[in-house]
Amino acid sequence: MTALFAQSLVTPSVGLIFWKTVAFLIFLYILYRFGWGPITESLEEREEEIEHSIQRAEEALEEAKAIQAENEEARREAEQKAQQILREARDSAEELREEEKAKTRREIQEMKEQAQAEIEREKQAALQELRDEVADLAIEAAQKIIENDLDADRHRQLVDDALDDFPTN
């Protein structure tokens, strides 16, 4: 019997082919009616899910690019701010140095002016002392001339003697 069954499978009869075809068509109808819809729905859902995943990935990529651009802009701004702070610090240091130079120059100029004023006062005091001494000598010489009514030679001699008594420094 197994041989007969095996024989019938190898050499199929028309009836067997007919019933196999009918069974296959019924299977296709049942599959189409009950299986095809859920399978296609499942495939469509999976396709939509994949599309959403791709869309979310693209959105995440765009968001990452935007964040990267913001970070780059923030880095550039921070770099510019740092450069500006350095420039301001250099300018402040230069300004402070110039102010100190000007202050030192003013102090030196004031010291020079004070020294010159002191020298001028000393000079005026020395000149006044010299005038007083010359006036005293002139008065003394005039007194001697008046006391001694002298001739021109004697007068010249008295003036020369008075000048010799005058200190040379």
Swiss-Prot record:
According to its UniProt entry, this protein's organism is Salinibacter ruber (strain DSM 13855 / M31)
What would be the name of the gene that encodes this protein? atpF
Question: Where does the chain cross the membrane?
Answer: 12-32
| Sorted UniProt keywords | ATP synthesis, Cell inner membrane, Cell membrane, CF(0), Hydrogen ion transport, Ion transport, Membrane, Transmembrane, Transmembrane helix, Transport
* InterPro entries (alphabetical): ATP_synth_B-like_membr_sf, ATP_synth_b/b'su_bac/chlpt, ATP_synth_F0_bsu_bac, ATP_synthase_B_chain
Q: Which family does it belong to?
A: Belongs to the ATPase B chain family.
Task: List, as start-end ranges, the regions of compositional bias called Basic and acidic residues.
Answer: 87-107
Q: How does it assemble?
A: F-type ATPases have 2 components, F(1) - the catalytic core - and F(0) - the membrane proton channel. F(1) has five subunits: alpha(3), beta(3), gamma(1), delta(1), epsilon(1). F(0) has three main subunits: a(1), b(2) and c(10-14). The alpha and beta chains form an alternating ring which encloses part of the gamma chain. F(1) is attached to F(0) by a central stalk formed by the gamma and epsilon chains, while a peripheral stalk is formed by the delta and b chains.
Pfam family membership, one: ATP-synt_B
What name is this protein filed under?
ATP synthase subunit b
A Gene Ontology molecular function term for this protein is:
proton-transporting ATPase activity, rotational mechanism
- Residues covered by region (Disordered): 69-107
